[in-house]
Every structure is written in structure tokens, then in C-alpha cells.
Amino acid sequence: MSSVPPTIGVLALQGDVREHIHALEQAGARARRIRRPDELDSIDGLILPGGESTTMGRLAAVFGLLTPLRERIAAGLPAYGTCAGMIMLADRLADGAPGQQTIGGIDMTVRRNAFGRQVASFEGTVEMTGVDGGPVEAVFIRAPWVESTGPGVQVLGRISRGDTAGRIVAVRQGRLLATSFHPELTGDTRVHRLFVDMVKG
């Protein structure tokens, strides 16, 4: 691995941009906001934060980012999607809105708002493969889950208890990572460290 800190962009259209930047810096990366296609040339990896996935897709199209994002990710740019960002990295949606567009890249089917609306948001812990030090603190806000994955996708984490036990909430495919939850809101930077290591990899 290189000793030079990687530069990781955070797509700054919606979501917890500042919190992701702070977590990336704590995890040993340089971080910058990404709003224009030309800014993609200056980064080694990209975080797609939470927000509202249909709005995020529309904004990405309006800002001329949708096609460049697809091309860069297809060409191997490491990316990490949280919540709505997970939806954006999905190849398929179980319940997509009419005309909803994603970036794709992970061979998975995702269900939006699977855990319920805002009132059903919750915090819990997730045992996550590839993350040392015990369970990860996880904040779920109108969160999706993964309905199914293709053979190249590694399931990293599932809900461990309750009536949603067994639901997939963290996956990896190659240099793409996605979680249903928001680690940037917890102060626990281990998932961001995992992604930084993937980018360095």
C-alpha cells in the first residue's frame, strides 16, 4: 500500500457530506466535495452519501454527473455508498420509482425504504466482516436493504435480531462497498477505514 494519503471525493448533492469528510480525514484520507464532472479526475475514490435516491439521481443528471459517474465506476473507481448511496450503486431496484436511474456497479437488488419511513428509523449494531473490534454502531434512516446478490458480491453484514433479522445491510463487490446504514453519524470510523484501505489497495 502507498504511504501517500488517497484523495477521496464525497458527492456533494445531498446528505451528510460534512460528516463523511470528517470521517475520511479521521481515517487517514484527504477528502473533497464533488459537484462537477471534471472534479472526478482528481480523486482516487468516491463516497455516495445518503439523501433521497430519486432526487439524488435527478440532481446527478442535472449536474451532468450521471454518465461520468457510471463510466468512472465501471472503469474501476472505488466507491462507497451509504443508504441512498447504496441504492445508487445497485444494478437493480425492487421498487424503483418510475424512471428512477441509478449508477449501478454492484450486482444486487435493493429495496428502498425497506425498514420503513422516518418514524421507523433506528440505531443498532451490525457484525461486519472485514471490520475488526466488534460490532459496528449503525444508524438506519429510511434505510434500504439488499433483497438479493449475484455470485460476485460478498455479504459483509446482516441484521442480527428482531423481525428483520437476516436482512443484508452491508455488501462489497471488488472495489465497491455499500451499507444501508450511516456510519458517518456515529463517530466510529472503522467502515471508512475499510474503504480507505480498499482505495489504497
From Swiss-Prot:
<feature type="active site" description="Charge relay system">
    <location>
        <position position="184"/>
    </location>
</feature>
<dbReference type="InterPro" id="IPR002161">
    <property type="entry name" value="PdxT/SNO"/>
</dbReference>
<protein>
    <recommendedName>
        <fullName>Pyridoxal 5'-phosphate synthase subunit PdxT</fullName>
        <ecNumber>4.3.3.6</ecNumber>
        <ecNumber>3.5.1.2</ecNumber>
    </recommendedName>
</protein>
<feature type="active site" description="Charge relay system">
    <location>
        <position position="182"/>
    </location>
</feature>
<comment type="function">
    <text>Catalyzes the hydrolysis of glutamine to glutamate and ammonia as part of the biosynthesis of pyridoxal 5'-phosphate. The resulting ammonia molecule is channeled to the active site of PdxS.</text>
</comment>
<feature type="binding site">
    <location>
        <begin position="51"/>
        <end position="53"/>
    </location>
    <ligand>
        <name>L-glutamine</name>
    </ligand>
</feature>
<comment type="subunit">
    <text>In the presence of PdxS, forms a dodecamer of heterodimers. Only shows activity in the heterodimer.</text>
</comment>
<dbReference type="InterPro" id="IPR029062">
    <property type="entry name" value="Class_I_gatase-like"/>
</dbReference>
<keyword id="KW-0456">Lyase</keyword>
<keyword id="KW-0663">Pyridoxal phosphate</keyword>
<dbReference type="GO" id="GO:0008614">
    <property type="term" value="P:pyridoxine metabolic process"/>
</dbReference>
<comment type="pathway">
    <text>Cofactor biosynthesis; pyridoxal 5'-phosphate biosynthesis.</text>
</comment>
<keyword id="KW-0378">Hydrolase</keyword>
<feature type="binding site">
    <location>
        <begin position="141"/>
        <end position="142"/>
    </location>
    <ligand>
        <name>L-glutamine</name>
    </ligand>
</feature>
<dbReference type="GO" id="GO:0042823">
    <property type="term" value="P:pyridoxal phosphate biosynthetic process"/>
</dbReference>
<dbReference type="Pfam" id="PF01174">
    <property type="entry name" value="SNO"/>
</dbReference>
<keyword id="KW-0315">Glutamine amidotransferase</keyword>
<dbReference type="GO" id="GO:0005829">
    <property type="term" value="C:cytosol"/>
</dbReference>
<comment type="similarity">
    <text>Belongs to the glutaminase PdxT/SNO family.</text>
</comment>
<dbReference type="GO" id="GO:1903600">
    <property type="term" value="C:glutaminase complex"/>
</dbReference>
<dbReference type="GO" id="GO:0036381">
    <property type="term" value="F:pyridoxal 5'-phosphate synthase (glutamine hydrolysing) activity"/>
</dbReference>
<dbReference type="GO" id="GO:0006543">
    <property type="term" value="P:glutamine catabolic process"/>
</dbReference>
<feature type="active site" description="Nucleophile">
    <location>
        <position position="83"/>
    </location>
</feature>
<dbReference type="GO" id="GO:0004359">
    <property type="term" value="F:glutaminase activity"/>
</dbReference>
<feature type="binding site">
    <location>
        <position position="112"/>
    </location>
    <ligand>
        <name>L-glutamine</name>
    </ligand>
</feature>
<dbReference type="InterPro" id="IPR021196">
    <property type="entry name" value="PdxT/SNO_CS"/>
</dbReference>
